Structures are given as C-alpha cells and as structure tokens.
C-alpha cells in the first residue's frame, strides 16, 4: 500500500458529486428523547466521479488511472472543486487566510490547516496535500517571501528560523484531498456508437 502523488484528471473531477460525511450514533429513548454521539472526531469525504465522464476518451483515462492505482490499493490526489482553497471560492488566496499556529521561539514546523466556522463552533481540518506553488505564508499578517519551505506531501511548513514567541503564523494555499478508489471493479458500458459510461466510480478520503 502506498500513496501516489498524482491527481485524478481535473476535467473529470469537475463533474463529480460528493462531499463530507459524518458518523453519528442516534439512540431513541423510551421517553421519545434522543441521545446522539459522534463516532468520528473528523469528517470523511466521499465522491462519485462517474458523472464527470462525457466522452469515450474520458472513460479511457479513468480506466488507465484505475489500473495504475491497482484499484483500491494505492491512494492519490483529488481536486474537490467545491472546496480546494484556503479562502472562499470567489476569493483569491492570500498569505493571511488561515491561522496555522503561534510562534514559541523554538518551534520551526507548522501543519497547514483550514478552519470551518459557523456561529460559535469551529472545526479544524488538517491539510496534508497542498498544491505545489500555491502556498503563501505570513508572520504577524506580513507575507514572508523567503525563510520557509513546505512539504507538499505532508502539508508541513518549516521555517529556517523559528518564529518568535507570540507571533501568529498564517498561510494561504490550494489543496487536494487524499483519496482511493472505493471499489476494485469498474463496470464499463460501451454502446453501439462507442460512447462509454460507468455506472458509479466511488472515491473515499483516506488519512495520510
């Protein structure tokens, strides 16, 4: 089992459907009340990319990609067109989009993350697959053009010199979702006009 640092074809993923999934246990009591407990601390995303296939060449590209990943065996990158930036979809990325930590004077590494807030509640999503060339970093709201690097396979930002104590570290970026195929079978249909289709191509988010 390995992770292949290659992205599922963008022209096909653009037409896909899917999104976050949560796992909640709901128990109905004799009184009619409910008890609800979260089984997962974090959400997991599912997608179906069959909707993005529009022509026979798209079908061939998916089959080749599936074979190269050995079905469910190897993970890969996927661009979720509904959520792939550190900012709102209509906005441009800036170096101050997301807070990723606070300097201690000794800590040199910081994990990229994205916050989802509504009301008083916030969920923090760890970003492990930033897109190369899109990451921007700021210290105390001032963009840093040098003095740091980012590992695009882990999402870890490393500073040459540790940010001083109390300095807010922020970042902006595009990112992919680490996924795998959720089936070892592709059910391909080819009609008389040689137009192909696949009923479903499920993808499942994985932890890397």
Where are each of the predicted segments found?
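Exposed beta-strand and adjacent loop surfaces of beta-rich binding modules
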Residues: 46, 132-136, 166
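Solvent-exposed edge beta-strands and adjacent loop segments
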Residues: 1-74, 177-196
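Extended beta-strand solenoid/passenger and fiber regions
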Residues: 63-147, 175-208
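Beta-strand-rich interaction surfaces with strong enrichment in secreted/lumenal proteins
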Residues: 36-37, 98-99, 158-161
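Beta-strand secondary-structure signal
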Residues: 46-50, 109-111, 168-170, 200-202
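Secondary-structure transition/turn motif
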Residues: 53, 114-117, 158-165, 207
């Amino acid at each position: 089992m390995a992770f292949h640092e290659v992205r599922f074809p963008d022209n096909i993923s653009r037409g896909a459907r899917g999104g976050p999934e949560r796992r909640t246990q709901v128990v109905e009591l004799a009184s009619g009340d409910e008890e609800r407990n979260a089984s997962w601390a974090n959400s997991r995303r599912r997608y179906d990319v069959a909707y993005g296939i529009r022509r026979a060449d798209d079908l061939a590209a998916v089959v080749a990609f599936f074979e190269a990943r050995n079905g469910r065996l190897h993970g890969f990158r996927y661009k979720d067109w509904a959520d792939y930036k550190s900012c709102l979809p209509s906005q441009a990325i800036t170096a101050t989009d997301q807070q990723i930590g606070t300097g201690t004077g000794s800590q040199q590494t910081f994990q990229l993350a994205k916050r989802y807030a509504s009301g008083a509640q916030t969920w923090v999503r760890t970003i492990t697959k930033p897109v190369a060339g899109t990451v921007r970093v700021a210290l105390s709201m001032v963009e840093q053009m040098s003095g740091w690097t980012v590992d695009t396979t882990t999402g870890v930002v490393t500073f040459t010199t540790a940010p001083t104590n109390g300095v807010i570290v922020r970042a902006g970026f595009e990112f992919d979702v680490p996924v795998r195929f959720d089936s070892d079978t592709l059910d391909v249909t080819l009609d008389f006009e040689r137009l192909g289709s696949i009923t479903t191509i499920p993808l499942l988010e994985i932890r890397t």
